[in-house]
């Protein structure tokens, strides 16, 4: 049998405008292009080799009332990885997306990406590392990873990663009656250069994660992360993040899918037992208006300060072209959900228009 090779060149072009109706009167205009090249070679019937390379090219301009306009341009790698598949094994090396867990909106185990639940495209920066996965005959799977060179905050991280320090961990996922469950572990050296008075702090950090999801006529899941730092840093020494969620599709019209999640956060000082507890909730819905259009929404509540984030999104699909009209309201401070430097959203009320072309 002759080995087969495949080449593909794809890409995504995004045009975006965002108008804030708050006191600052912020206006944003931007474009983004993510070209993607993939090469896939079949070695034999049980093994293959693949390469993916993509870049993130962005141009933007921001105007705030009473301030001069700010223009930015950026070119950075988005994904650059090599993958080797051999029977039940997968090895992937390079800049890649690593994502797992059962929660949809408020995600304690969002350890390695920056996906914002308000972003309809789910864009995120990747991490540099080696990922190894083994798939067992009973459909259970084992993940092992090692990371290096990823100093930025990710997910709900309170601290950053120490420069030039390796990270490693693993995950085992298996099936349970009516669903699946997984146990995860990750180790890194954390530093606090983003926190005043703790700029010289660094400490080994251990985190354990558990997640499960079952289908009992409706979806139900839980997700948990416990983080322990061996050196005391006040209430950030120990952190517990616990999520409960459900979803159900109602037989209304074309089918209304509703999801509800709760996130509980508890940070504790090992020496004084001082703690900080916070609560968050999120409600989302999605309703298909037809074969090519849908309406979705998100209500996000921060219980400690009684503030809300609201979003209503209309999507229209035209073959390779998609359009989004997003109405939103964000408080000045948003906690409990991931925010990144790719998806632009401002405080106060506003409207966002997205046009996406995939080739």
Show which residues each predicted segment covers.
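Outer-membrane beta-barrel channels and translocator barrels
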Residues: 4, 42-46, 86-89, 98, ...
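Outer membrane beta-barrel
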Residues: 40-142, 147, 174, 332
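Residues that define the transmembrane beta-barrel architecture of outer-membrane proteins
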Residues: 27-33, 73-78, 85, 124-128, ...
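Detector for outer-membrane/organellar transmembrane beta-barrel domains
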Residues: 176, 213-302
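Transmembrane beta-strand segments that form the barrel wall of outer-membrane beta-barrel proteins
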Residues: 12-23, 52, 56-57, 113-117, ...
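Surface-exposed beta-loop-beta
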Residues: 153-245
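Outer-membrane beta-barrel "beta-signal"
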Residues: 316-318, 328, 345-359
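Outer-membrane beta-barrel architecture
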Residues: 36-38, 80-83, 131-133, 171-173, ...
